[in-house]
């Protein structure tokens, strides 16, 4: 109902109330047919008055209603409770005092107003006790962890040194997937599941960790992770390359522990010396090939005769390719 309609209704009711007062004071004819007609006329008069004054009163009434809606909940509760107690007590006292000579409706009205004012004043003094419990804010920010990063396990060390700020969220469907892996008959899947659960235990000791029971929309686990991270305004931590690409499409911030590890790996420079296991021969004559811990290939000139041996080599050249860095080296002096 619009505010203007409330004004019309209020003035119509005022007209009916005025008719009742005039009847009680004997200022209207007491004929039943005329009483009904006079009530109708006064109600219509009130309605017409409302139509005339409504546009002017609407703005002021809207401002008052807006102010009432902005009142703290504890003030509304205290005022309502105080008014109710005051009115109930006024009804009781009016019933008891009705037989007292000289006690009129005016006295009853004044008594009611006084009691309501008194109990509202008292209730507002204790409004802190009527304060409603504030709803727990929905979690925001932090990091959402997926299955791949838990199975990897390095996220626990990263969190332990403080590189993952904010709360860590593990969706219940990710935990369920880890449990399914841990109960698998496949030894490899079972080992992954148990490693993921062990990572969770270490994470609880390193950072605030909470299992989210929320089930976001989406059919696949990847879609649920993306929607959940977006709803929480959180970053998604994953080692899944396809999921990282989907996160960019969905506009979700994504972090990769694998990318962090690659960024922090020591960078070999020309002239550096290292021990390298020669695994196979290279494409060119007398070349041997070995690999660093991060998978980078090292081609050793004159290293073919050391196949199957770990020797000391000196880096002679480093090339950046699309798939990573490629190093060239030669056996150090004294290599056997």
From Swiss-Prot:
UniProt KW Transmembrane helix keyword: yes
Domain of life: Bacteria
Residue ranges of the TM segments: 34-54, 75-95, 106-126
Membrane-related topology note: Multi-pass membrane protein
Signal peptide: 1-23
Domain TRAM: 267-328
Any single Gene Ontology cellular-component annotation: membrane
Gene Ontology molecular function, alphabetical: metal ion binding; nuclease activity
InterPro entries for this protein: Nucleic_acid_metab_PIN/TRAM, PIN-like_dom_sf, PIN_dom, TRAM_dom
Domain called PINc: residue spans: 144-255
SUPFAM superfamilies: PIN domain-like
Subcellular location: Membrane
PROSITE patterns, A to Z: TRAM
Main location: membrane
Cofactor: Mg(2+)
Xref: Gene3D superfamilies: 5'-nuclease
Keyword Transmembrane helix: yes
Protein family per UniProt: Belongs to the PINc/VapC protein family.
Record protein name field: Uncharacterized PIN and TRAM-domain containing protein TTHA0540
Protein source organism: Thermus thermophilus (strain ATCC 27634 / DSM 579 / HB8)
